[in-house]
Design a protein with these regions (language model features):
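Catalytic cores of RNA-modifying enzymes
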Residues: 1-115
Length: 115
């Protein structure tokens, strides 16, 4: 796992419209409906608690997960420290530069404030 930035305090921040899908059944149904494969690089916007990130790590080659909330980011660092196919970034996705040198797919349980 690669990681970039801060740490976790534990409260949901409604100003950034956090919402979490925690049902493994729902997550696997969502992932199954995508065309993500073992060869894909995936960018996940707002991984939150990492439930979807886990499934994406199983399904794809590499996941770059961008989390704005420093608290959640800290938990993600701990949760994924033994994974070797994930990069965690503590940044606002809206201010993050998308990669130009590789193809990628985007997956997100999009925070309401972005839409």
């Amino acid at each position: 796992m690669k990681a970039k930035s801060n740490n976790y305090r534990g409260k949901v921040d409604i100003s950034v419209s956090q919402n979490f899908i925690t049902s493994k059944n729902t997550i696997y149904k969502l992932i199954k409906k995508t065309n993500i494969s073992k060869n894909d690089f995936v960018i996940e916007i707002g991984p939150g608690k990492g439930h979807i990130t886990e499934a994406l790590c199983e399904k794809s080659y590499w996941v770059t997960a961008i989390e704005l909330d420093r608290s959640l980011y800290g938990n993600l660092i701990n949760k994924f420290k033994s994974k070797n196919n994930v990069t965690l970034i503590n940044k606002d996705f809206l201010n993050w530069k998308l990669p130009k040198k590789r193809e990628y797919k985007v997956f997100s349980n999009i925070p309401f404030y972005i839409t």
